[in-house]
Protein backbone atom coordinates (compact mmCIF):
# COMPACT_ATOMS: atom_id res chain seq x y z
CA UNK A 1 0.00 0.00 0.00
CA UNK A 2 1.23 3.47 -0.87
CA UNK A 3 2.06 5.69 2.14
CA UNK A 4 -0.29 8.35 0.81
CA UNK A 5 -3.24 5.95 0.77
CA UNK A 6 -5.37 5.23 3.81
CA UNK A 7 -7.31 2.06 4.69
CA UNK A 8 -9.30 0.67 1.80
CA UNK A 9 -7.00 2.23 -0.78
CA UNK A 10 -8.51 5.75 -0.55
CA UNK A 11 -6.06 8.57 -1.13
CA UNK A 12 -5.68 10.83 1.90
CA UNK A 13 -6.16 14.57 1.45
CA UNK A 14 -3.47 16.95 2.57
CA UNK A 15 -5.53 18.63 5.30
CA UNK A 16 -6.24 15.21 6.85
CA UNK A 17 -2.73 15.39 8.28
CA UNK A 18 -3.82 18.39 10.44
CA UNK A 19 -5.84 17.97 13.60
CA UNK A 20 -9.51 19.01 13.44
CA UNK A 21 -9.13 21.83 15.96
CA UNK A 22 -6.33 23.42 13.94
CA UNK A 23 -8.54 23.50 10.83
CA UNK A 24 -11.32 25.21 12.83
CA UNK A 25 -8.89 27.83 14.14
CA UNK A 26 -7.82 28.49 10.55
CA UNK A 27 -11.45 29.11 9.52
CA UNK A 28 -12.02 31.44 12.45
CA UNK A 29 -8.87 33.34 11.58
CA UNK A 30 -9.90 33.70 7.93
CA UNK A 31 -13.41 34.92 8.85
CA UNK A 32 -11.95 37.63 11.06
CA UNK A 33 -9.33 38.71 8.55
CA UNK A 34 -9.40 42.34 7.34
CA UNK A 35 -10.42 41.25 3.84
CA UNK A 36 -13.43 39.25 5.07
CA UNK A 37 -14.48 42.04 7.41
CA UNK A 38 -14.31 44.52 4.53
CA UNK A 39 -16.49 42.30 2.34
CA UNK A 40 -19.00 41.86 5.17
CA UNK A 41 -19.33 45.62 5.47
CA UNK A 42 -19.80 45.83 1.68
CA UNK A 43 -22.54 43.20 1.93
CA UNK A 44 -24.37 45.14 4.65
CA UNK A 45 -24.09 48.38 2.68
CA UNK A 46 -25.46 46.78 -0.50
CA UNK A 47 -28.31 45.08 1.37
CA UNK A 48 -29.26 48.39 2.98
CA UNK A 49 -29.16 50.16 -0.38
CA UNK A 50 -31.26 47.47 -2.09
CA UNK A 51 -33.86 47.57 0.70
CA UNK A 52 -34.07 51.36 0.41
CA UNK A 53 -34.47 51.08 -3.38
CA UNK A 54 -37.37 48.64 -3.00
CA UNK A 55 -39.09 50.88 -0.46
CA UNK A 56 -38.76 53.82 -2.86
CA UNK A 57 -40.20 51.76 -5.72
CA UNK A 58 -43.23 50.92 -3.58
CA UNK A 59 -43.70 54.57 -2.57
CA UNK A 60 -43.41 55.64 -6.21
CA UNK A 61 -46.07 53.10 -7.16
CA UNK A 62 -48.42 54.44 -4.47
CA UNK A 63 -47.79 58.03 -5.61
CA UNK A 64 -48.56 57.06 -9.21
CA UNK A 65 -51.84 55.37 -8.28
CA UNK A 66 -53.08 58.23 -6.09
CA UNK A 67 -52.05 60.86 -8.65
CA UNK A 68 -53.98 59.03 -11.38
CA UNK A 69 -57.05 58.92 -9.14
CA UNK A 70 -56.74 62.67 -8.66
CA UNK A 71 -56.59 63.17 -12.44
CA UNK A 72 -59.69 61.00 -12.94
CA UNK A 73 -61.47 63.06 -10.29
CA UNK A 74 -60.51 66.33 -11.99
CA UNK A 75 -61.94 65.10 -15.30
CA UNK A 76 -65.37 65.06 -13.66
CA UNK A 77 -65.20 68.82 -13.42
CA UNK A 78 -66.50 69.23 -16.98
CA UNK A 79 -69.86 67.73 -16.01
CA UNK A 80 -70.06 68.55 -12.29
CA UNK A 81 -72.38 71.35 -11.12
CA UNK A 82 -70.01 72.49 -8.35
CA UNK A 83 -66.42 72.95 -9.53
CA UNK A 84 -65.09 74.10 -6.16
CA UNK A 85 -66.25 70.91 -4.45
CA UNK A 86 -64.18 68.77 -6.83
CA UNK A 87 -61.17 71.08 -6.52
CA UNK A 88 -61.36 70.83 -2.73
CA UNK A 89 -61.57 67.04 -2.90
CA UNK A 90 -58.64 66.92 -5.32
CA UNK A 91 -56.57 69.08 -2.97
CA UNK A 92 -57.31 66.63 -0.16
CA UNK A 93 -56.11 63.76 -2.35
CA UNK A 94 -52.95 65.66 -3.30
CA UNK A 95 -52.24 66.27 0.39
CA UNK A 96 -52.27 62.49 0.83
CA UNK A 97 -49.85 62.15 -2.08
CA UNK A 98 -47.55 64.72 -0.49
CA UNK A 99 -47.41 62.59 2.66
CA UNK A 100 -45.96 59.84 0.47
CA UNK A 101 -43.57 62.44 -0.95
CA UNK A 102 -42.49 63.23 2.62
CA UNK A 103 -41.59 59.57 3.11
CA UNK A 104 -39.55 59.68 -0.10
CA UNK A 105 -37.72 62.78 1.15
CA UNK A 106 -36.96 61.04 4.44
CA UNK A 107 -35.66 57.95 2.62
CA UNK A 108 -33.40 60.10 0.42
CA UNK A 109 -32.02 62.15 3.30
CA UNK A 110 -28.22 62.08 3.11
CA UNK A 111 -28.31 60.04 -0.12
CA UNK A 112 -27.39 60.91 -3.68
CA UNK A 113 -30.71 61.56 -5.43
CA UNK A 114 -29.35 60.39 -8.78
CA UNK A 115 -28.57 56.91 -7.44
CA UNK A 116 -32.24 56.35 -6.58
CA UNK A 117 -33.85 58.56 -9.23
CA UNK A 118 -34.91 55.63 -11.38
CA UNK A 119 -36.92 54.20 -8.48
CA UNK A 120 -39.06 57.32 -8.02
CA UNK A 121 -39.14 59.05 -11.42
CA UNK A 122 -42.47 57.52 -12.50
CA UNK A 123 -44.24 58.73 -9.37
CA UNK A 124 -42.69 62.20 -9.61
CA UNK A 125 -43.82 62.62 -13.22
CA UNK A 126 -47.36 61.51 -12.40
CA UNK A 127 -47.48 63.91 -9.45
CA UNK A 128 -46.35 66.81 -11.66
CA UNK A 129 -49.08 65.89 -14.14
CA UNK A 130 -51.78 65.87 -11.43
CA UNK A 131 -50.66 69.12 -9.79
CA UNK A 132 -50.28 70.97 -13.10
CA UNK A 133 -53.72 69.72 -14.24
CA UNK A 134 -55.34 71.05 -11.08
CA UNK A 135 -53.43 74.34 -11.40
CA UNK A 136 -54.57 74.78 -15.01
CA UNK A 137 -58.21 74.25 -14.06
CA UNK A 138 -57.89 76.90 -11.36
CA UNK A 139 -55.84 79.55 -13.18
CA UNK A 140 -55.63 78.54 -16.87
CA UNK A 141 -51.84 78.75 -16.57
CA UNK A 142 -48.85 76.44 -16.11
CA UNK A 143 -47.47 75.85 -12.64
CA UNK A 144 -43.73 76.46 -12.33
CA UNK A 145 -41.19 73.92 -11.17
CA UNK A 146 -40.23 76.27 -8.32
CA UNK A 147 -43.82 76.29 -7.05
CA UNK A 148 -43.99 72.48 -7.13
CA UNK A 149 -40.73 72.21 -5.20
CA UNK A 150 -42.02 74.78 -2.70
CA UNK A 151 -44.99 72.51 -2.03
CA UNK A 152 -42.59 69.62 -1.39
CA UNK A 153 -40.88 71.28 1.58
CA UNK A 154 -42.04 69.67 4.82
CA UNK A 155 -41.51 70.40 8.51
CA UNK A 156 -41.88 67.52 10.96
CA UNK A 157 -41.74 67.20 14.73
CA UNK A 158 -39.90 64.64 16.85
CA UNK A 159 -42.36 61.88 15.93
CA UNK A 160 -41.71 62.35 12.19
CA UNK A 161 -45.22 63.70 11.48
CA UNK A 162 -45.66 66.88 9.47
CA UNK A 163 -46.15 69.98 11.60
CA UNK A 164 -47.72 72.89 9.69
CA UNK A 165 -48.27 75.11 12.74
CA UNK A 166 -45.36 76.69 14.69
CA UNK A 167 -44.76 75.24 18.18
CA UNK A 168 -46.71 76.92 20.97
CA UNK A 169 -44.97 78.81 23.77
CA UNK A 170 -43.58 76.51 26.40
CA UNK A 171 -43.37 73.53 24.05
CA UNK A 172 -39.83 72.43 23.33
CA UNK A 173 -40.23 70.57 20.04
CA UNK A 174 -37.38 69.82 17.69
CA UNK A 175 -38.57 70.58 14.15
CA UNK A 176 -36.87 69.08 11.11
CA UNK A 177 -37.18 70.35 7.54
CA UNK A 178 -37.31 67.89 4.63
CA UNK A 179 -37.07 68.83 0.95
CA UNK A 180 -37.76 66.80 -2.16
CA UNK A 181 -36.80 68.47 -5.43
CA UNK A 182 -38.39 67.66 -8.76
CA UNK A 183 -35.71 67.42 -11.46
CA UNK A 184 -36.13 69.46 -14.67
CA UNK A 185 -36.53 66.26 -16.70
CA UNK A 186 -39.33 64.96 -14.44
CA UNK A 187 -41.03 68.35 -14.65
CA UNK A 188 -40.87 68.43 -18.47
CA UNK A 189 -42.12 64.85 -18.81
CA UNK A 190 -45.00 65.54 -16.42
CA UNK A 191 -46.00 68.65 -18.39
CA UNK A 192 -45.82 66.68 -21.64
CA UNK A 193 -48.22 64.10 -20.20
CA UNK A 194 -50.48 66.94 -19.06
CA UNK A 195 -51.21 67.82 -22.70
CA UNK A 196 -52.97 64.49 -23.21
CA UNK A 197 -55.23 65.13 -20.23
CA UNK A 198 -56.03 68.62 -21.53
CA UNK A 199 -56.98 67.15 -24.89
CA UNK A 200 -59.46 64.79 -23.17
CA UNK A 201 -60.78 67.68 -21.09
CA UNK A 202 -61.33 69.67 -24.28
CA UNK A 203 -63.41 66.92 -25.93
CA UNK A 204 -65.43 66.28 -22.75
CA UNK A 205 -66.18 69.96 -22.25
CA UNK A 206 -67.53 70.26 -25.79
CA UNK A 207 -69.86 67.35 -25.14
CA UNK A 208 -71.25 69.25 -22.15
CA UNK A 209 -71.85 72.42 -24.15
CA UNK A 210 -68.75 74.33 -22.99
CA UNK A 211 -67.54 76.19 -26.09
CA UNK A 212 -64.91 78.40 -24.41
CA UNK A 213 -62.66 75.72 -22.88
CA UNK A 214 -61.43 74.22 -26.21
CA UNK A 215 -60.09 77.60 -27.36
CA UNK A 216 -58.42 78.24 -23.99
CA UNK A 217 -56.83 74.79 -24.08
CA UNK A 218 -55.74 75.27 -27.69
CA UNK A 219 -53.98 78.54 -26.91
CA UNK A 220 -52.28 77.03 -23.87
CA UNK A 221 -51.11 73.93 -25.77
CA UNK A 222 -49.61 76.09 -28.53
CA UNK A 223 -47.51 77.90 -25.95
CA UNK A 224 -46.39 74.60 -24.39
CA UNK A 225 -45.56 73.16 -27.81
CA UNK A 226 -43.52 76.26 -28.72
CA UNK A 227 -41.57 75.88 -25.50
CA UNK A 228 -40.83 72.21 -26.17
CA UNK A 229 -39.84 73.05 -29.74
CA UNK A 230 -37.03 75.25 -28.41
CA UNK A 231 -35.63 72.17 -26.65
CA UNK A 232 -36.09 69.95 -29.71
CA UNK A 233 -33.62 67.09 -29.97
CA UNK A 234 -30.99 68.84 -27.87
CA UNK A 235 -32.60 67.82 -24.58
CA UNK A 236 -32.90 64.39 -22.95
CA UNK A 237 -34.10 61.54 -25.13
CA UNK A 238 -37.31 61.07 -23.14
CA UNK A 239 -38.28 64.73 -23.63
CA UNK A 240 -37.71 64.72 -27.40
CA UNK A 241 -39.71 61.48 -27.60
CA UNK A 242 -42.72 63.22 -25.97
CA UNK A 243 -42.67 65.99 -28.57
CA UNK A 244 -44.53 63.88 -31.12
CA UNK A 245 -47.27 62.98 -28.62
CA UNK A 246 -47.62 66.64 -27.67
CA UNK A 247 -48.03 67.59 -31.32
CA UNK A 248 -50.77 64.96 -31.71
CA UNK A 249 -52.70 66.36 -28.75
CA UNK A 250 -52.39 69.89 -30.11
CA UNK A 251 -53.61 68.91 -33.58
CA UNK A 252 -56.68 67.16 -32.11
CA UNK A 253 -57.60 70.21 -30.05
CA UNK A 254 -57.06 72.52 -33.03
CA UNK A 255 -59.31 70.32 -35.17
CA UNK A 256 -62.00 70.55 -32.49
CA UNK A 257 -61.70 74.35 -32.42
CA UNK A 258 -61.83 74.46 -36.22
CA UNK A 259 -65.03 72.41 -36.26
CA UNK A 260 -66.55 74.65 -33.60
CA UNK A 261 -65.79 77.79 -35.59
CA UNK A 262 -66.86 76.46 -38.99
CA UNK A 263 -69.65 74.02 -38.17
CA UNK A 264 -70.58 74.92 -34.61
CA UNK A 265 -73.85 76.52 -35.61
CA UNK A 266 -74.82 73.53 -37.81
CA UNK A 267 -74.28 70.73 -35.28
CA UNK A 268 -76.37 70.48 -32.07
CA UNK A 269 -74.30 70.78 -28.91
CA UNK A 270 -75.15 67.29 -27.69
CA UNK A 271 -73.73 65.83 -30.95
CA UNK A 272 -70.47 67.79 -31.04
CA UNK A 273 -68.58 65.32 -28.84
CA UNK A 274 -69.56 62.41 -31.14
CA UNK A 275 -68.38 64.33 -34.20
CA UNK A 276 -65.03 65.13 -32.56
CA UNK A 277 -64.50 61.57 -31.37
CA UNK A 278 -65.09 60.26 -34.91
CA UNK A 279 -62.66 62.82 -36.35
CA UNK A 280 -60.09 61.91 -33.70
CA UNK A 281 -60.34 58.22 -34.62
CA UNK A 282 -59.89 59.09 -38.31
CA UNK A 283 -56.78 61.15 -37.52
CA UNK A 284 -55.33 58.29 -35.46
CA UNK A 285 -55.92 55.83 -38.31
CA UNK A 286 -54.29 58.14 -40.86
CA UNK A 287 -51.24 58.62 -38.61
CA UNK A 288 -50.91 54.88 -38.03
CA UNK A 289 -51.04 54.22 -41.80
CA UNK A 290 -48.50 56.90 -42.60
From Swiss-Prot:
Region of interest called Interaction with C1D, as start-end residue ranges on this chain: 73-208
InterPro entries associated with the record: Translin_C (IPR016069), Translin_fam (IPR002848), Translin_N (IPR016068), Translin_sf (IPR036081)
**Start-end of Basic and acidic residues biased regions:** 16-28
Could you provide one GO biological process annotation from this protein's UniProt record? spermatogenesis
Q: Where is the secretion signal located?
A: none
Q: Does the keyword Cell membrane apply?
A: no
Q: Which residues bind Mg(2+)?
A: 129, 197
Q: List the keywords (alphabetical).
A: Cytoplasm, Developmental protein, Differentiation, DNA-binding, Golgi apparatus, Isopeptide bond, Magnesium, Metal-binding, Nucleus, Spermatogenesis, Ubl conjugation
UniProt cross-link Glycyl lysine isopeptide (Lys-Gly) (interchain with G-Cter in SUMO2), position = 279
Record family assignment: Belongs to the translin family.
Q: What does this protein do?
A: Acts in combination with TSN as an endonuclease involved in the activation of the RNA-induced silencing complex (RISC). Possible role in spermatogenesis.
Q: What is this protein called?
A: Translin-associated protein X
**Organism for this UniProt entry:** Rattus norvegicus (Rat)
